[in-house]
Amino acid sequence: MAHNQVFPESQKWLKEYLESSLEQFENLFNKNVISTESIRNYTLIRTLGSGSFGRVMLSQHGGDNPQKCYAIKILNKEKVVKMKQVEHTMNEKRILLSIGSPFVVRCLNAFKDTTNLYMVMEFVNGGELFHLLRKKGRLPEYWCTFYAAQVTMALQYLHNCSLLYRDLKPENILLDHLGYLKVTDFGFDRRVQGHTWTLCGTPQYLAPEMILNRSYASQWTTGGLGILIYELNAGFVPFDHKVPLKLYELIVECRLTFPSFFKPTLRDLLTNIIQVDVTRRFGNLRNGALDIINHPWFKDTDFRKILMKAEKAPWVPNLKGQWIHQTFDKWTEESISISKHDKYPDEFSNF
């Protein structure tokens, strides 16, 4: 298939969007605002998720519309210190407060008390893309192009802000009430300047250069995007094995096979994104994301319209009745205790 033609109009709007969004990110990142908000102003409703040193709770703010909810990430200071995650957490707070993409979950506020650190995230209430994919088996092609367009723009936005997102998978993509996507669960600990060799991410979505211990700071994670597009269309990932080393071999060999129902345009796009040689991988060439945006598989997809959320989503979650129990797993609840004395006043003084 012929190399993509770069259309001037797509080049112009993408360039303008990336320039303005980077300027906004830099302005917020350099401010490092310290909030005096208190957790006592929130009603904690239920646990949405739990991790090594904290949990995420569905919450409401006393002064807001009672229908408006937030997802508050609550981190225990003592656990953060013991796990040597102070610097990571401080950097993550700064980065999350600076992000402003419509396809990335935003952090609206961050504050602390004597015991915990709190990050107030926008609550995306339609559940995970993973659950939709498991329910449907595989998704219609139009759904796939609609979702892939948003993830492409989310990854390009993060890359443009020097942020490396290394855990792309359906479980980390949420659906909002309009049926649009938001990427979440970043784990950002720094802005990438130079090179990084860290092996992290979900095994089936790892890029070959991560497994081969090659630096990958200069390449945005289009390999993971290719795996996601494949899985949405097929219902399964292209490389899988229960033995990790065997799985890594399959990823590095990169011998792609396609279901018979994959169209030639989809096969061509995936062959060029799921590509071991980063010098030939779409997204990393001279035209950047435009090689993906202008690919024939996306010929009926209006990226600008999707960016403005003016395109009607192919599927909208049903949020009536007991939706919270249908879209989020049940967790054991624990009360949030706040001590009188702060054992770590210096470590988190700038949080």
UniProtKB/Swiss-Prot annotation:
Domain AGC-kinase C-terminal: 299-351
Keyword Transferase: yes
Residues of the Protein kinase domain: 42-298
Binding site for ATP: 48-56, 73
InterPro entries the UniProt entry points to: AGC-kinase_C (IPR000961), Kinase-like_dom_sf (IPR011009), Prot_kinase_dom (IPR000719), Protein_kinase_ATP_BS (IPR017441), Ser/Thr_kinase_AS (IPR008271), STKc_PKA (IPR044109)
GO molecular function: ATP binding; cAMP-dependent protein kinase activity; protein serine kinase activity
EC number, as in UniProt: 2.7.11.1
Protein name in UniProt: Spermatozoon-associated protein kinase
Annotated active site: 167 (proton acceptor)
Organism: Aplysia californica
Catalytic activity: L-seryl-[protein] + ATP = O-phospho-L-seryl-[protein] + ADP + H(+); L-threonyl-[protein] + ATP = O-phospho-L-threonyl-[protein] + ADP + H(+)
Tissue spec. comment: Ovotestis.
Enzyme type, top EC level: transferase
Phosphoserine PTM positions: 339
